[in-house]
């Protein structure tokens, strides 16, 4: 009863304590982190570049939205969750928002699950 739908999706929600935390994070960000994020974004985009179900990918860095051809985003979310992967929706898109520090191995594992779900025949 503590968390409401969507509550877990905000890293820095705007109150003074989290804003102070955000300032510390900004002090720690360096070019190496940004280069790693760009490489991870490229990996995500390349993974889905030839996936028929993916119409387009919007966003930047690791905050991405995947527009689907036919599948319903909510159905994909449920199927991913059943496989152990948490993804969100943003209207009719699949919303990806992994931590900036996600390892390449973890990212590839999650992308493989999502790719398998997207390549399954439509159950609807």
Predicted regions and their residues:
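Conserved N-terminal phosphate-binding loop of PLP-dependent enzymes in the Aspartate aminotransferase
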Residues: 1-124
């Amino acid at each position: 009863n503590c968390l409401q739908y969507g509550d877990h999706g905000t890293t820095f929600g705007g109150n003074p304590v989290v804003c102070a935390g955000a300032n510390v994070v900004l002090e720690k960000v360096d070019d190496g982190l940004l280069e790693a994020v760009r490489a991870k974004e490229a990996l995500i985009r390349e993974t889905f570049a030839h996936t028929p179900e993916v119409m387009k990918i919007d966003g930047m860095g690791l905050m991405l939205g995947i527009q689907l051809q036919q599948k319903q985003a909510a159905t994909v979310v449920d199927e991913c969750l059943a496989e152990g992967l948490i993804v969100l929706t943003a209207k009719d898109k699949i919303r990806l928002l992994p931590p900036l520090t996600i390892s390449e191995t973890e990212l590839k594992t999650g992308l493989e699950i999502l790719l398998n779900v997207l390549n399954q025949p439509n159950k609807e």
